[in-house]
């Protein structure tokens, strides 16, 4: 029992469940959109999904690869096998299916597309013919007969006159040609038809009689074409007309809009003169199908060329896909040649026949002497000079078999020899080889068309291509700004060409900049065609415009591959030409060496060139020879331009090189000297391209980051190597010239790179400055100086950098390569400090560089550009990742289990989990594990409705709420984490928690190690260091301080650092005394600072002791934090010593401490204060010395306190009073401060 279409019904039910998100066991995320589906369906449709879903339930796809809308289409196709109704980019869907390894979907779509395109031209077409109208009879009364020819081999007879159609009825024509051509009714009982049927070898079903009716033009044309002479031209015209008739519906639909046709026709430069006027007349009446019928009538009358109509249709091939398909299906063998049935040789080109009979030619030609003699004795018009040179090069030093193979290769691949020229040569020597004459006669009878002619020069060929594809290219290039951007990125353009192109594009204010460039090539001839094609290749490479389809079609043109090779790799074309003449060049070089006409440098280069061109005769093919020459030239570091310079020098004394020079000039490498007919030089354009290529390659090899300082290796340059160029092409730029070989460069860095490789500089002898001994090279001189004098030849060479030791975070022990990295780590991980904020959106950042990266999101600035593909990025890290990922630059991370390579180590870690099965991210609710955190997030979002999960960094578990997360840390990781009891914030170190808790009790945990100033926030301490200790702050942070000024306390002058400050003190204030540390000799302006320094740095212990317990601390800020958190409540008041930071519970204890511990300091500071300003509190009468400290109520000390000294002008200054005053007393008027100048 078989259930019909049960599989389709099952898939439909699965698709219904998928849309309802029932029984779905996997999730596909694209950006923020999630698709639920069934693993089995995805795995069956895609090999990629099958591999990924084997180990996971969640797949994340980048939205740049496939958009959610496109993936929805693909998903529907997987379940239903149908593409939903609507507008879709079908080729994009095929490409996406291919990239996702949905090969069945991609192949099915491609097959469907192919069948849709070919359905109109495949199989036998059967048409119903209808009776002609009376108008037709009136128009063509002079054509009374109908002529019908049956196709040969159309089938055996199976009809009789009784089966013929009645007058006026439709007739089915079963022959293929008739089916494509006949469009009018043929009446029965025609004697002519009966005669044709009797004479045909295989008669078809035709009418037997015909009344006096006129045939259609199609019938007449078809009849004439089938029964006329066997000339190839007539048969070719018939087949070209047949092509137009086959696609009549497609072409007439494309030409439906008359105004559009006339506009395109006006722009088309390929259709000119009478042909253009003829087409315009055809569109004067009714357009559309009627206009195309009028065009077909003109073609039948031979007043309009078929190729002109095809050129008109080509203008629509990119706006009308049906026209493009029809033109692409127009095969050359069906259009240009006619091969009758029963023949295997006739109809093939002469070049194809020569290739097919290569073995016969090798057997016929047994010696080369007759060929050489015929070339020497032949008349000048026998063959062209180029063809003679090609034949001579193929014959020199080779066997007859190798010569025939090379001649055929020159004819088919390089297009430097025509088939007709080769046949002429063989005809001239056929008397010497008897069998050769019979073979040539047979081939010439079979051949129908001449083969391709000699390839024109690259510029001429490029001009012809531009003329042919001008309109298509103009439709693509409509943005002048893109053109200007691409022109600026072209490196192989000469400066003059670049300026001309930019000027032409900028002159056109609209979108016709490309038309201006084409006009400069085709009409004004102020620009070379190769420059335009170089621009097009750059545009295609950068994917700036949709140029791929058109370039693919252009590359199918005959000779296009050789042209584009010459445009993109002129050096290969140059070496290929030199290789063809290698024997002649070697002879010329050897002759000049024997006559000793070379300089020492030229002789060295000549020997190298001889070695490069000495290819053994047993080399398999010309391609292998070229590869060998390229390999040797690269190995010897001899570019093609140096060989060309050598040939220009050799040619002056060896005129026999003239054919080589002409051929090199033919491809644009050489040009004649001004005013000299037979003197050659390397063209400026080729010179520029060679320089750019060499410099880019050298700079790429030498550009290792961090290995050179800013000044570079100037020691390798003998003296100052640059000077102004007198004839620089751009007066605004300098030209740096090598003193050894006079080669000029626009950039100094390129000159430095060149100097390392300059052969002339290396060949010159250099003298040792120490002992006047001469050496052949700089390298030998360096070796001599090192051995004889114990010093290197480059005294200014940069010293090797010391290895930088890593720095360690004192809170968590993590190591960093640089101190700046550790500082950023502390700010973000430990202190949660973000001092830099965005003015646009208020976002805060820990580093200024991070803020700058963020600001580019608002400004849209993308300053980092990829040198390979010109993509731009907002961050340098994004560019670095891109160059690693897309262009394989820099360190890559390889998988030890497979061949996969990744740009970042984290990517490798994620990938390795696919091999090991490790799933470190575990869902707390259901226990499901995931290899990536993203997979866990999607799982929580999809299955548990948890928007933002909280992950534990210790055990990778996830929690839905912050409370659950904190509870987990208290229970499981209490020893590892330290939560704040007040706010619940968690810290990874006890010291971090202590500093944080102070913020709740009003303490100041961040204290200055120099002056003991304490702050509640780290940012306050930073600001204090910047303003009060700028030199120390700059030294600690390895960068110049923002507030780099140190003020003199005596004269208010400011200084950038302590050294300058000390110099100033010694010079201007010599009487001022500094306090020096006995152990480290450091100077301090006040004794209090010295005392704090000794306690903190040299005591070796923790000098600050708690008064209430046995705890000791190294810094006063830590003591203050301890006292405020352990011994006092937040409302209680402490009395800190401003000099040493010690804390006291009462003012009396503080005063006692000041008298016992800091009497000298108090005395010194009292004198300094009295010399500048008197600060007094007026009292009714002096008090006894034992009552100098005024004690106030504790309620009055609840606020901040100010300590004031009271100098006694009448008594000794040592008996000055110390008064503690609260801010409340100053505000409510209880105490009044009277300040005045000291007398």
From Swiss-Prot:
UniProt biased composition (Low complexity): 200-212
Region listing for Disordered, in residue ranges: 130-231, 687-732, 779-801
Recorded superkingdom: Eukaryota
Example GO biological process: regulation of transcription by RNA polymerase II
Keywords recorded for this protein, A-Z: DNA-binding, Isopeptide bond, Metal-binding, Nucleus, Phosphoprotein, Repeat, Transcription, Transcription regulation, Ubl conjugation, Zinc, Zinc-finger
Main subcellular localisation: nucleus
Cross-link Glycyl lysine isopeptide (Lys-Gly) (interchain with G-Cter in SUMO2), where in sequence: 1066
GO MF annotation list: DNA binding; DNA-binding transcription factor activity, RNA polymerase II-specific; zinc ion binding
InterPro entries: BTB/POZ_dom, SKP1/BTB/POZ_sf, ZBTB40_BTB_POZ_dom, Znf_C2H2_sf, Znf_C2H2_type
Domain called BTB: residue spans: 24-87
Pfam family, one: zf-C2H2
Zinc finger (C2H2-type): 807-830, 836-858, 864-887, 893-915, 921-944, 950-973, 978-1000, 1006-1029, 1046-1069, 1075-1098, 1104-1127, 1135-1158
This protein's record includes keyword Acetylation: no
Compartments, as annotated in UniProt: Nucleus
Biased composition range(s): Polar residues: 181-199, 705-719
Biased composition (Basic and acidic residues): 136-145, 687-703
Residues modified as Phosphoserine: 190, 703
Family listed: Belongs to the krueppel C2H2-type zinc-finger protein family.
Task of the protein: May be involved in transcriptional regulation.
Protein name listed in UniProt: Zinc finger and BTB domain-containing protein 40
Gene that this polypeptide is encoded by: ZBTB40
């Amino acid at each position: 029992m078989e259930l019909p279409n049960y599989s389709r019904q099952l898939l439909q039910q699965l698709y219904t469940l998928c849309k309802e998100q029932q029984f779905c066991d996997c999730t596909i995320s694209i950006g923020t959109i999630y698709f639920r589906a069934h693993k089995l369906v995805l795995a069956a449709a895609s090999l990629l999904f099958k591999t990924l879903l084997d180990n996971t339930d969640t797949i994340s796809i980048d939205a740049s690869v496939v958009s959610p809308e496109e993936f929805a289409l693909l998903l529907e196709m997987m379940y239903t096998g149908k593409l939903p109704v609507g507008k879709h980019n079908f080729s994009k869907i095929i490409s996406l299916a291919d990239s996702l390894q949905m090969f069945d979907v991609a192949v099915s779509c491609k097959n469907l597309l192919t069948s849709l395109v070919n359905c109109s031209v495949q199989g036998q077409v059967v048409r119903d013919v209808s009776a002609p109208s009376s108008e037709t009879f009136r128009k063509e009364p002079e054509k009374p007969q109908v002529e019908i020819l049956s196709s040969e081999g159309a089938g055996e007879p199976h009809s009789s006159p009784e089966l013929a159609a009645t007058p006026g009825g439709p007739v089915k024509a079963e022959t293929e040609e008739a089916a494509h051509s006949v469009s009018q009714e043929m009446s029965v009982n025609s004697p002519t038809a009966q005669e044709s049927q009797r004479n045909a070898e295989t008669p078809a079903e035709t009418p037997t009689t015909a009344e006096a009716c006129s045939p259609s033009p199609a019938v007449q044309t078809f009849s004439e074409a089938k029964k006329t002479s066997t000339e190839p031209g007539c048969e070719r015209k018939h087949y070209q007309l047949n092509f137009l008739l086959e696609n009549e519906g497609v072409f007439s639909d494309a030409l439906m809009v008359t105004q559009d046709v006339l506009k395109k026709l006006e722009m088309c430069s390929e259709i000119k003169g009478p042909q253009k006027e003829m087409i315009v007349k055809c569109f004067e009446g009714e357009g559309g199908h009627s206009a195309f019928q009028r065009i077909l009538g003109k073609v039948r009358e031979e007043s309009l060329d078929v190729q002109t109509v095809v050129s008109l249709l080509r203008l629509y091939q990119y706006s009308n896909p049906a026209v493009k398909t029809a033109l692409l299906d127009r095969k050359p063998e069906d259009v240009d040649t006619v091969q009758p049935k029963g023949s295997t040789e006739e109809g093939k080109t002469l070049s194809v026949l020569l290739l097919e009979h290569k073995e016969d030619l090798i057997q016929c030609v047994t010696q080369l002497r007759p060929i050489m003699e015929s070339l020497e004795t032949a008349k000048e018009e026998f063959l062209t000079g180029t063809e003679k040179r090609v034949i001579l090069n193929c014959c020199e030093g080779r066997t007859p078999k190798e010569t025939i193979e090379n001649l055929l290769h020159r004819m088919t691949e390089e297009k430097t020899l025509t088939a007709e020229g080769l046949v002429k040569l063989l005809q001239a020597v056929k008397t010497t080889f008897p069998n050769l004459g019979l073979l040539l006669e047979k081939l010439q009878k079979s051949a129908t068309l001449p083969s391709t002619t000699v390839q024109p020069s690259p510029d001429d060929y490029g001009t012809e291509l531009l003329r042919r594809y001008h309109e298509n290219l103009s439709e693509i290039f409509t943005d002048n700004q893109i053109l200007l951007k691409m022109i600026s990125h072209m490196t192989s353009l000469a400066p003059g060409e670049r300026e001309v192109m930019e000027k032409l594009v900028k002159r056109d204010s609209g979108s016709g900049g490309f038309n201006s460039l084409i006009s400069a090539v085709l009409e004004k001839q102020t620009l070379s065609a190769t420059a335009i094609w170089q621009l097009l290749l750059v545009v295609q490479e950068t994917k700036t415009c949709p140029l791929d389809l058109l370039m693919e079609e252009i590359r199918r043109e005959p000779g296009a591959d050789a042209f584009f090779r010459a445009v993109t790799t002129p050096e290969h074309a140059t070496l290929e030409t030199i290789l063809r003449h290698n024997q002649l060049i070697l002879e010329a070089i050897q002759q000049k060496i024997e006559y000793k006409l070379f300089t020492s440098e030229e002789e060295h280069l000549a020997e190298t060139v001889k070695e490069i061109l000495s290819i053994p005769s047993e080399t398999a093919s010309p391609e292998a020879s070229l590869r060998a020459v390229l390999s040797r030239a690269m190995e010897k570091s001899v570019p093609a331009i140096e060989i060309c310079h050598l040939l220009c020098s050799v040619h002056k004394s060896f005129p026999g090189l003239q054919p080589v020079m002409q051929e090199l000039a033919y491809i644009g490498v050489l040009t004649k000297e001004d005013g000299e007919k037979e003197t050659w030089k390397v063209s400026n354009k080729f010179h520029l391209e060679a320089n750019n290529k060499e410099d880019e390659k050298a700079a790429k090899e030498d550009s290792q980051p961090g290995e050179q300082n800013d000044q570079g290796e100037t020691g390798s340059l003998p003296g100052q190597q640059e000077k102004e160029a007198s004839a620089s092409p751009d007066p605004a730029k300098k030209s740096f010239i090598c003193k050894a070989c006079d080669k000029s460069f626009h950039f100094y860095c390129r000159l430095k790179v060149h100097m390392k490789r300059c052969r002339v500089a290396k060949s010159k002898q250099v003298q040792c400055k120490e002992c006047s001994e001469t050496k052949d090279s700089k390298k030998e001189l360096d070796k001599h100086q090192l051995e004889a004098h114990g010093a290197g030849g480059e005294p200014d060479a940069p010293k090797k950098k010391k290895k930088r030791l890593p720095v360690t975070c004192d809170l968590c022990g993590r190591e960093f390569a640089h101190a700046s990295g550790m500082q950023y780590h502390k700010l973000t991980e430990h202190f949660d400090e973000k001092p830099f904020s965005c003015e646009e959106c208020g976002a805060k950042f820990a580093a200024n560089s991070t803020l700058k990266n963020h600001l580019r999101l608002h400004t849209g600035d993308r300053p980092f550009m990829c040198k390979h593909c010109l993509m731009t990025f907002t961050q340098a890290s994004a560019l670095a990742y891109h160059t690693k990922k897309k262009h394989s630059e820099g360190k890559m991370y390889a998988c030890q289990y497979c061949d996969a390579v990744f740009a970042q180590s984290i990517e490798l870690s994620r990938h390795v989990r696919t091999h090991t099965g490790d799933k470190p991210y575990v869902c707390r609710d259901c226990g499901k594990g995931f290899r990536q955190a993203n997979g866990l997030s999607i799982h929580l979002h999809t299955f548990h409705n948890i928007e933002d999960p909280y992950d534990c960094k210790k055990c990778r578990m996830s929690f839905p709420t912050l409370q659950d997360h904190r509870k987990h840390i208290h229970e499981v990781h209490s020893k590892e984490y330290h939560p704040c009891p007040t706010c619940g914030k968690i810290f990874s170190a006890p010291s971090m928690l202590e500093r944080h808790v102070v913020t709740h009790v009003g303490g100041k945990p961040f204290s200055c190690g120099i002056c003991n100033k304490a702050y509640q926030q780290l940012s306050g301490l930073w600001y204090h260091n910047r303003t009060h200790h700028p030199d120390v702050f700059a030294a600690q942070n390895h960068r110049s301080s923002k507030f780099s000024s140190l003020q003199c306390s005596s004269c208010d002058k400011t200084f950038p650092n302590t050294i300058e400050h000390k110099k100033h003190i010694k010079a201007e204030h010599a009487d001022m005394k500094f306090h020096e540390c006995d152990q480290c000799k450091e100077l301090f302006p006040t004794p209090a600072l010295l005392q704090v320094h000794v306690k903190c740095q040299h005591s070796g212990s923790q000098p600050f002791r708690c008064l209430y317990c046995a705890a000791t601390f190294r810094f006063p800020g830590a003591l203050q934090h301890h006292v405020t958190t352990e011994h006092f409540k937040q409302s209680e008041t402490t009395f800190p010593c401003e000099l040493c930071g010690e804390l006291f519970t009462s003012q009396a204890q503080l005063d006692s401490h000041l008298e016992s511990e800091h009497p000298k300091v108090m005395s010194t500071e009292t004198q300094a204060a009295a010399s500048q300003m008197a600060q007094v509190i007026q009292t009714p009468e002096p008090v006894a010395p034992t009552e100098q400290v005024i004690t106030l109520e504790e309620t009055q000390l609840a606020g901040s306190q100010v300590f004031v000294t009271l100098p006694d002008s009448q008594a000794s200054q040592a008996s000055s009073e110390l008064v503690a005053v609260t801010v409340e007393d100053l505000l409510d008027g209880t105490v009044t401060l009277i300040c005045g100048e000291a007398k």
